[in-house]
């Protein structure tokens, strides 16, 4: 069995990979997916630097609504405070450094589960039992460190990078592309978390191309997915995209009769948006669903999976039954995607793994590789 050049690091291999024009492009090399060293670079240069999607803003609608996450090893909470402001802050107690909140929910205050130090929703320490005998203790000196948080198109985005450009500035091209869909007005109706046994980029790339649909999804949507109906233009620096036209009989994927924003063929267009590094959105005129991905080691990915409906369908008497059918379909599609992407990761770990040439329908994958190289190997 012929082995590849082991003197190159995965970072070097990625740089060589994207040096080829798209017309000669190959898939990314295996080490980019399987290497601990490459993952460390990603956490430092991608997930600590770029904006990460947490959830939809309407999922945190009331004061005290919160959700938690670990971003590049940093425990973070996103919470709506008493003034109605969404804020992200450290999820680590300032006493003995226990994490504070778990999962998602609603709380009147933030209480440490270890010694009951209690914080207001804005992160200021409200009280700490049995601290009066410590002469240097001052309650007013304690406040949870804040993390940058912005709302964009209804999404809650956070970053550990104080110098990252605003989300709206980076993604102005997305607004130009789908502004008439009114994505900021769509309502989230479900949210789940999952962990799959594959690399996060394998799942991201699986979303970015629809080339796999007829085969991987033969049991669900494959028969409705015509390769000739898929359009994959070159991507932008902060995102890539492609689109598919849906048949008119797929009611929820088409514009509602009361939708006056969308005209012509746009009333049946489905956009697949990949917002770097790891927000993946399927946006139709009637509903949306998304994945927000974070690595859990090289061989596992943590998935924040949600979706919902456009405002016209939210108010339609038949909408809930339509969406329940779509959610059942999405669950079945995810079973197929999980099987395919976990097989890919097992193959990537093989000594025989070699990157093959890309189809013209995998243009988004090439653009994603270029984005990663720009972050990992900056000029």
Model-based region annotation:
Residues 80, 85, 91, 150, ...:
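C-terminal catalytic domain of Rieske-type non-heme iron oxygenases
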Residues 26, 30-71:
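Non-catalytic accessory segments flanking enzyme active sites
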Residues 13-30, 184:
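Short, contiguous pre-domain boundary segments
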Residues 49-59, 128-133, 273-277:
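Short Pro/Gly-enriched beta-strand edge/turn motifs at strand-loop
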Residues 2-16:
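Fe(II)/2-oxoglutarate
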Residues 59-162, 166-176:
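Rieske [2Fe-2S] iron-sulfur-binding domain
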Residues 6-7, 18, 173, 177:
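Peripheral, non-catalytic segments flanking oxidoreductase cores
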Residues 47-51, 98, 212:
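Generic structural signal for secondary-structure transition and capping sites
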């Amino acid at each position: 069995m012929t082995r590849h050049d082991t003197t190159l690091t995965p970072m070097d291999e990625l740089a060589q990979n994207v040096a080829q024009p798209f017309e000669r492009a190959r898939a990314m090399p295996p080490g980019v997916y399987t290497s601990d060293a490459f993952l460390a670079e990603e956490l430092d240069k991608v997930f600590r630097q770029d904006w990460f999607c947490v959830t939809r803003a309407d999922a945190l609608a009331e004061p005290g609504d919160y959700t938690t996450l670990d971003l590049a090893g940093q425990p973070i909470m996103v919470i709506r405070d008493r003034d109605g402001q969404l804020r992200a802050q450290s999820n680590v107690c300032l006493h003995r450094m226990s994490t504070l909140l778990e999962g998602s929910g609603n709380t009147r205050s933030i209480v440490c589960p270890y010694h009951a130090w209690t914080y207001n929703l804005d992160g200021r320490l409200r009280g700490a039992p049995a601290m009066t005998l410590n002469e240097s203790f001052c309650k007013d000196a304690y406040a949870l460190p804040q993390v940058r948080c912005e709302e964009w198109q209804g999404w809650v985005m956070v970053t550990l990078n104080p110098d990252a450009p605003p989300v709206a500035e980076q993604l102005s091209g997305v607004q130009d592309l789908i502004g008439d869909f009114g994505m900021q007005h769509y309502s989230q109706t479900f949210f789940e978390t999952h962990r799959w046994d594959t690399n996060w980029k394998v799942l991201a790339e699986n979303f970015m191309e629809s080339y796999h649909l007829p085969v991987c999804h033969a049991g669900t949507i494959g028969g409705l997915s015509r390769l000739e109906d898929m359009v994959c233009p070159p991507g932008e620096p902060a995102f890539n995209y492609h689109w598919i036209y849906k048949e008119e009989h797929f009611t929820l994927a088409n514009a509602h009769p009361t939708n006056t924003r969308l005209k012509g063929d746009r009333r049946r267009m489905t956009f697949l948006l990949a917002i770097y590094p790891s927000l993946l959105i399927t946006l139709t005129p009637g509903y949306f669903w998304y994945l927000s991905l974070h690595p859990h080691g090289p061989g596992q990915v943590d998935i924040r999976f949600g979706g919902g409906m456009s405002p016209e369908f939210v108010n339609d008497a038949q909408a809930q039954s339509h969406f329940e059918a779509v959610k059942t379909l999405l669950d079945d599609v995810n079973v197929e995607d999980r099987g395919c992407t976990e097989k890919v990761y097992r193959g990537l770990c093989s000594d025989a793994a070699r990157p093959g040439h890309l189809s013209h329908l995998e243009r988004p994958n090439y653009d994603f590789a270029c984005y990663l190289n720009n972050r990992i190997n900056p000029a």
